[in-house]
Design a protein with these regions (language model features):
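N-terminal Rossmann-like dinucleotide-binding module
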Residues: 1-40
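Internal alpha/beta domain cores that form substrate/cofactor-binding pockets in large enzymes
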Residues: 4, 28-31, 61-80, 85, ...
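Structural motif corresponding to alpha-helix initiation and N-cap regions
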Residues: 13, 46, 70-74, 118
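Donor/substrate-binding cores of folate-linked one-carbon enzymes
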Residues: 25, 84-200
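N-terminal beta-loop-helix "entrance" segment that forms/cooperates
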Residues: 36-54
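Internal anion-binding site segments
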Residues: 195-306
Length: 306
C-alpha cells in the first residue's frame, strides 16, 4: 500500500521506521514540520523524523510545508496517490482538503476520548494514571474526535517520565499501525463517548514552575510529566533535576525546609508529604549533586531549600 506519513517527533519516528521496514507498504512521502532553532545557540535543527529519514532512508522524499491550508500542500500530497495517510504527532490540524485525499489514520498517544489535544502523555502522568495507551483513529475535522479503530495500552511504571513513556508508547503505536492497516477492511469503527472526553493543551515552559506549597505527590507527577522539558524549577530559578517521593501524606509545618540530609540527597518538606532531592541545576549553571549545592550555599537541616 502507498503511504504518506505525517509526523514530527521521536514518537512518530518509530512508527515511520516500522512502516519503512514492512514490505507490504511503500512510504512515498514524509510530511513533517519545518526545521527549528534549538538551544541557547539557536542551531537550526531538523525534526526527529526528518533526521532519521536522511540517515536511514535517503531516497524518501521529505516535504516541510509551513502551512497545510494552501493549494501547494494539497497538490503535493494528492500527487502521491496514497492509499492511506498515517498521522502521528504531526503538529498541525489537517484541513478537509487533505482529509478527503485518502483515509487518514491518526495514532494518538492516549486512550481516547481521554486527553484529546497536544500533550496526552504529559497529561497522563500529571493525573497519575495507572495506564497509558495509543488509539488508532480515522480522522475528521475535529481535534481527535474521529471514530476509533483500535487500542494498545500499557501499565505506567511508578517512576516513568514523559520521555520513557513516549518511548514505550511509540513501540506500541508502531505495532498498532501495522495491525490497523492489515485489518482495515474488517475493522468495525466505533464512536467516542463525548461525555468521557477530556482535553489537554500544549505544554509551556512556565508550566514547570513549582512551589513547596504543593503536595509532594503533585510535585512528583509534575517532575515525571515535565522531564525532560520543561523540567520543574522553583521561583528562584533552581531546577530540580532528580528527585523521588519519600512520603505522600504527612503534614508539615516547616514547608520548604530541609528535614534531613542523607548520602543520597536532602529531604524537603512540602505542604503534604516530603521529597528526596538528589540533583539540582542552578540558573545558568550545570546540574550538580544537591549535596554540593547545599554545601556551597551553607544550608543545613531546618534551612529553606531555595
Amino acid at each position: 500500500m502507498r503511504i504518506v506519513f505525517m509526523g514530527t517527533p521521536a514518537y512518530a519516528t518509530r512508527i515511520l521506521e516500522a512502516l519503512m521496514q514492512a514490505i507490504e507498504h511503500d512510504v512515498v512521502l514524509l510530511v513533517t514540520q519545518e526545521d527549528k532553532p534549538v538551544g541557547r545557540k539557536q542551531i537550526l535543527t531538523p525534526p526527529d523524523t526528518k533526521a532519521w529519514a536522511q540517515e536511514h532512508a535517503p531516497s524518501l522524499e521529505i516535504y516541510q510545508p509551513k502551512h497545510l491550508r494552501n493549494d501547494e500542500a494539497v497538490s503535493k500530497i494528492a500527487a502521491c496517490r496514497a492509499d492511506f495517510i498515517i498521522v502521528a504527532a504531526y503538529g498541525q490540524i489537517l484541513p478537509a482538503s487533505i482529509l478527503a485525499l485518502a483515509p487518514c489514520i491518526n495514532l494518538h498517544a492516549s486512550l481516547l476520548p481521554k486527553y484529546r489535544g497536544a500533550s496526552p502523555i504529559q497529561s497522563t502522568l500529571l493525573a497519575d494514571e495507572a495506564y497509558a495507551g495509543v488509539t488508532s483513529m480515522l480522522m475528521e475535522e475535529g481535534l481527535d474526535t474521529g471514530v476509533m479503530l483500535g487500542f494498545s495500552y500499557l501499565h505506567v511504571k511508578p517512576n516513568d517520565t514523559s520521555e520513557q513513556l513516549f518511548e514505550a508508547l511509540s513501540d506500541a503505536a508502531a505495532s498498532l499501525t501495522l495491525k490497523t492497516l492489515a485489518h482495515f477492511e474488517q475493522l468495525q469503527p466505533w464512536k467516542q463517548v463525548d461525555a468521557a472526553m477530556t482535553h489537554c493543551r500544549k505544554i509551556k515552559k512556565e508550566d514547570g514552575l513549582v512551589s513547596w506549597q504543593e503536595k509532594a505527590q503533585t510535585l512528583m507527577c509534575k517532575y515525571r510529566a515535565f522531564t525532560p522539558w520543561p523540567g520543574i524549577y522553583l521561583a528562584s530559578g533552581l531546577k530540580l533535576t532528580e528527585l523521588s517521593l519519600i512520603d505522600a501524606i504527612g503534614k508539615n509545618s516547616r514547608i520548604g525546609c530541609i528535614e534531613r540530609i542523607t548520602n543520597e540527597g536532602v529531604v524537603v518538606a512540602c505542604i503534604q508529604g516530603s521529597l528526596l532531592i538528589s540533583k539540582v541545576q542552578p540558573s545558568s549553571k550545570n546540574a550538580m549533586h544537591v549535596l554540593d549545592y547545599i554545601r556551597g550555599k551553607r544550608l543545613t537541616c531546618g534551612d529553606s531549600m531555595v
